[in-house]
């Protein structure tokens, strides 16, 4: 039987991908996106790893019934992960709306999305609830205000596990306390090209923060995209964590900007050649793998930040990078595709978009 809630959500997901945005989000150099995530659990139930299916179903039902009454999810039911096709699950991971863990162990896992896909709630992942709010810049105040209101609502309407000494209780001890993970996706091609990235990663880690690949723990930084997040959740307030993260990101942005200046002065022809070749490939490809695509688009995002192509198209570049991922292509086509079909379709999407991108104007 077709789940109408799942169909409506995937249709909305597809519409957002295909929309020609008029009010585009403001972007800043180096920063791609940001996220605040809260881990919460219900009192009286075992953590997900140790709970029986019946208890997990009860947890999900309670959470879903409560969320349906919240204005962001008014009359929106959660949908079961097991109701999704494989490529639909993968698209949600590619879009960072849910984790790889949620789609791998999905017996009683559910997901709720806001209409704009900027807020998502995972049920029965590692914790009973994983609440996420996304942004396109460093405006953590607005993001925190939004997630804090939602969290207050859940705490008022559900019996959330909380200890006066330790704070919010979570399945993983490293999340105990605030239960908050704040992260920023940054684009650091120049630090990689100038071989400074290892030193930067070590410096960030010494300050108590973690640097991971594009899709978090265990993933590769394809296209030189890195995720920086807090490691400590106990003994610090949410405001302290966010303030420290913002300071670190600003420092990383400065180091990346300085590395780009070094490339302009010392390896100018090499830099221009790489950017020019990437644009040529994107305009002329007829079959393109996902890694090649993200590496070429990465150079175009760098070119936009450095004003070699209009900065105004950076948002579009970020979006085309998402649309050209394998599962997203299948969502757009609304059917599963073979690998060769995906690579041909990806090339078609990229050719069409980059035909509209102005030629690179080097200094």
Could you tell me what each predicted segment is?
Residues 1-165, 180, 194, 199-201, ...:
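Long, Pro/Ser/Thr-rich low-complexity/intrinsically disordered regulatory tracts in eukaryotic proteins
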């Amino acid at each position: 039987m077709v789940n109408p809630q799942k169909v409506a959500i995937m249709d909305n997901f597809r519409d957002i991908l295909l929309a020609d945005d008029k009010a585009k989000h403001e972007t800043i150099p180096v920063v791609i996106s940001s996220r605040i995530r809260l881990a919460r659990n219900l009192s009286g139930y075992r953590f997900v790893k140790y709970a029986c299916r019946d208890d997990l179903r009860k947890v999900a039902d309670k959470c879903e019934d409560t969320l349906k009454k919240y204005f962001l999810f008014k009359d929106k039911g959660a949908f079961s992960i097991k109701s999704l096709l494989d490529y639909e699950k993968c698209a949600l991971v590619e879009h960072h709306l849910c984790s790889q863990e949620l789609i791998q162990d999905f017996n009683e896992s559910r997901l709720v999305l806001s209409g704009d896909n900027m807020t998502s709630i995972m049920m029965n992942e590692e914790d009973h609830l994983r609440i996420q709010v996304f942004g396109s810049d460093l405006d953590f105040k607005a993001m925190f205000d939004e997630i804090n209101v939602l969290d207050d609502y859940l705490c008022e309407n559900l019996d959330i596990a909380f200890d006066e000494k330790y704070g919010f209780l979570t399945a993983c001890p490293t999340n105990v306390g605030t239960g908050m993970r704040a992260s920023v996706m940054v684009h650091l091609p120049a630090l990689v090209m100038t071989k400074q990235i290892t030193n930067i990663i070590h410096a960030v880690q010494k300050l108590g923060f973690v640097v991971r690949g594009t899709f978090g723990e265990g993933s590769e930084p394809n296209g030189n995209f890195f995720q920086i997040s807090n490691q400590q959740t106990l003994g610090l307030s949410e405001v302290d964590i966010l303030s420290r993260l913002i300071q670190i990101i600003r420092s990383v942005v400065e180091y990346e900007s300085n590395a780009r200046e070094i490339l302009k002065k010392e390896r100018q022809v090499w830099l221009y050649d790489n950017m020019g070749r990437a644009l040529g490939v994107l305009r002329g490809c007829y079959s393109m793998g996902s890694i090649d695509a993200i590496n070429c688009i990465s150079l175009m995002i760098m070119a936009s930040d450095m004003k070699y192509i209009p900065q105004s198209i950076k948002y579009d570049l970020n979006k085309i990078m998402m649309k050209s991922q394998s599962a997203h292509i299948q969502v757009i086509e609304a059917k599963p595709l073979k690998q060769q079909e995906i690579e041909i379709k990806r090339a078609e999407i990229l050719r069409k978009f980059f035909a509209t991108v102005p030629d690179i104007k080097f200094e």
